[in-house]
Amino acid sequence: LGFYAQDEWNLGNSLKLTYGIRFDNLMFDNDDLQRNDAIYELDFDGQHIDTGKWPDSRWQISPRIGFVWDVFKDKSLKVRGGTGVFTGRLPLVFFTNMPTNASMVQNSVTFKTQYDNGKVVGHDSRLDQLAGGMITDMNQIIDKFNLPTTIEKHVAGSKISGVAQDFKMPQVWKSSIAVDYQVPVSFPLTVTGEFMFTKNVNAVTINNINIKNPDEWKYNKLTTVKGADGKDVTTTELLHTGMQRFNGADNRMVYSYSLYDNPDKNVKYAGDFVHYNGKNAVVLDNTSKGYGYTANITVNAQPVDDLMLMLAYTHTESKEVSGLPGSDPISTWQGLNTIDGSNYVDAQRSQYVVPDKVIASVGYYIPFRHKGLLRGTHLNLFYSGYSSGGYSFCYTNDMNGDGINNDLMYIPKDDSEINFKTEEDRVAFWKFVEQDSYLKNHKGQYAEAYAARAPWVHRFDFRLLEDFEFKIGKTKHCFQLSFDIMNVGNLINSKWGISKSNTVSNSNRILKYEGVKSATDLTPGFSMYKVNGEYPTKTYDTYQNYSECWKLQVGIRYVFN
């Protein structure tokens, strides 16, 4: 439910103010929900998840104001801008995950007949209940199979999803300023500069409340031997209390660890002692972390009749805790690239941002003023240049022991900050680092999520459009015939207009964590990952996909009078 009010105020002939306020409220109905008591009884350090209740409905207020100032009152220089709060809505599939993961609203039942070499070897007699006509009434299906319609015993599933009771829909504070300047020359020439800053007010984040406070973490040595009866007997020896960190330059948090060299296979170190229980319990919540800005400059010109020129450059930065990469809260939480785990993420570069982009276009119109069907020809060439993707340098496996393979890599500044399994690994690693601009320029730092950019791709699109006009009686008919060649440069040269892929470097996962030196010396060791049995020597290679090739599109359009 939303309400909006807006007004304009002209201050003289040169300044116009526009101001307004919006009220939004997303309301919920709890009647169709039922609490799973088995989930609610789980204690996560005093927190409980109520799967039978949506967040509290609340009004969100979004005031805003904008202005346009005609500086010289002749439209040659305009300054415009504004500031305000804007409310959006996240994909509500993240809400519906709460009841669907509550083990209360759905159940899978499989009836099947088994065959072997065309012969029936197993038949579920319940299938006989389906003999006859098609059944579309759910109540008939329930009656035929005597399916339960009430929940007799609540059971907590392995995946639990919740929504914070005070959850708010996403809100951002946006501020912008722009200048439009008509350059005093003999032909139309306009230069526009724009800047917009965005700060998160209520962004969306997901936390796993099943992870204990780090001060409560325990690390154990587990030894398993055969007992007198031949059964395995495991003894536990406490090694550490309180969260541990790796030794050395890469001193990230340790959830669980293994030894670099552990010939005694019946000994395991640091089992899972950082969770309250065996359930993943993720909760949708809010955070104010994150911001973004965009700066743009655009030039438009018409130096001669029927010739239009445009050139624009845009620089964008965006930092966020989570871009919600998925539709399932568990996989979304696990999908974050992190250093210390998905619960300990600061604002990092958005995986969807394109930091720099250049576009340009040339358009020319050739009119035909003689009698005939053809009335004009439009020629257009459009250019776009940008980095085709942002990537993260991560380890190939789970270094910090949180059970998720999303650990951002530490980029050592020299040999003193990293231990390799072999000399060949060391040589191959440094050779790879020196050929990669991101790694080479960020030594001694943790790799930032999605901060490594693929090489720029330059693409041109060409359009030829013909205007046709004729009369039937007194009625004039117009239609257009167009020919579009997308990525026309690739038609000229098969190497042009092709983006780069990082599959040649195992998607930027070049180091494998091999474990720590000992139970008391948590210094990590690494090996260089091999792709198809060979050390990678370059980060990017040609992306071979039909989507990179040139395309021809022919269109026809009728223009109604």
Q: What would you call each of these model-derived segments?
A:
Residues 145-148, 270, 371, 376-473, ...:
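Extracytoplasmic gating/loop element in the C-terminal half of outer-membrane beta-barrel translocons
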Residues 11-14, 57, 71-77, 184-188, ...:
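Short loop/turn motifs that connect adjacent beta-strands in outer-membrane beta-barrel proteins
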Residues 3, 19-25, 81-85, 193-197, ...:
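Transmembrane beta-barrel strands of outer-membrane/channel proteins
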Residues 194-374, 378-388:
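Gram-negative outer-membrane beta-barrel transporters
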Residues 31-62, 66-283, 455:
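Solvent-exposed loop/turn elements at secondary-structure boundaries
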Residues 24-28, 74, 84-90, 186, ...:
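Structural signature of outer-membrane beta-barrel domains
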Residues 3-9, 65-69, 177-181, 297-301, ...:
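Residues on the lipid-exposed face of transmembrane beta-strands in outer-membrane beta-barrel proteins
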Residues 547-561:
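Outer-membrane beta-barrel "beta-signal"
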